[in-house]
Amino acid sequence: MIINFVGNTLIIFNEDIPCDLLRKKYKELFVPTISVLDFKKKRLYRKYNNIFLYTYKNYSFLWELENNILHKVQKCLNKNGILKLIIYLNKNDVITPDKHENKNNNDIKVNIDQKDYCENYINDIFKNIKKECLYNGFINIVNETSVAENGIILNITAENPDFLSNEDNDVSSDDEDLYNNEDDKKKVVNRVCDNCTCGKKEKLLNSENKVLINEKDGEYITENVVSSCGNCYLGDAFRCASCPYKGLPAFQPGENVKLNLNNESN
């Protein structure tokens, strides 16, 4: 059974004779094909909108844990891409018990409704495959069963989801601009206690572009000092209680200001 397909499609065939015949027909139509074995071994460098997987009788490889083919198919599909599983079940392989012995003996044979049994058998197969598809990230998994000349065909369709909404996709570099905000770039200066004993005050005073010390005059001459609150230059009304500039008039940002150590107690 050859399926009408759209562009950007890959056909995967299991290693069996009926699938080999289909492979030749698809090659005549210039449709890319690959065997299940090669698909699992080779590395593909492109993604497809549609992947069809044909298998005849044998479908147990669909739930092999190691190198799971459904997982690789999902990785090779574009978002919202479609996986189509075409599984042919031979009529003789669908085990259909048609006899049960009556417990009352007398060798009475009871016919079992073969149609109902086949439906249950097919439903069990579909449930197992659906579970494997869900485990590997597929959604919207449906099955359409059709009757062939000597068997039954399961046409299982699954979709590779695109969980990113339009709003999520609209996330742009604007978020990075938030981190480039000038307010975030303000240099943070840790304040030092007046009676510092840990040595932090000494390190701060000796670091370059911080404070110049004039021990003879008992004065601090500030140079390029960055205020921790940013309000020191505005005047006492805007200064905190422990501000070293307390009592000094307002000054221009970046202006050198002398602090008299002798008046520190005042």
From Swiss-Prot:
Query: Which cofactor(s) are needed, names only?
Result: [4Fe-4S] cluster
Question: What InterPro entries does its record include?
Answer: Anamorsin, CIAPIN1
**Any one annotated GO CC term:** cytoplasm
One Gene Ontology molecular-function label: metal ion binding
Q: Is the keyword 4Fe-4S in the record? A: yes
Annotated localization? Cytoplasm; Mitochondrion intermembrane space
State how it assembles: Monomer.
* Protein name, per record: Anamorsin homolog
Q: Which organism is it from?
A: Plasmodium falciparum (isolate 3D7)
What lineage does the source organism belong to?
Eukaryota, Sar, Alveolata, Apicomplexa, Aconoidasida
